[in-house]
Amino acid sequence: MKYLGIDFGLRRIGLAISEGDLASPWQILEVKSFSDAVEKTSIIIKEGHFQKIVVGLPEGKMGQNVAGFVNALDKRGLNVEVVDETLSSKKALQVMIEQGASQKKRRFEDAYSAAEILQNYLDNK
């Protein structure tokens, strides 16, 4: 099965992929608006033939934005699952530092967060 992990943001969306048991950071989507985020993500999902989409759900106000994003993807008939993303950004930054990532490469933190979200899902499915 082909999986896509998503760390949703209103400016940047981190993406990670997996075709088995190991999630890998993939790319960052730059978005201008909520509708732009839904459109760009939907295109990637369809073009990539992903069978399962895993979206991290944070607490608080951003959680409401993520819920709206998930709802918009659901309305397009996409197979979306929501998982807790508590500490995913912190873990992602820790992994990047341990791997010696430069400040320039740390701009990919959202993709690493998406990989943490997806890996947690894969480990617990």
Regions found by a protein language model. Name each.
Residues 2-6, 10-125:
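Phosphate- and other anionic-substrate recognition elements at nucleic-acid/protein interfaces
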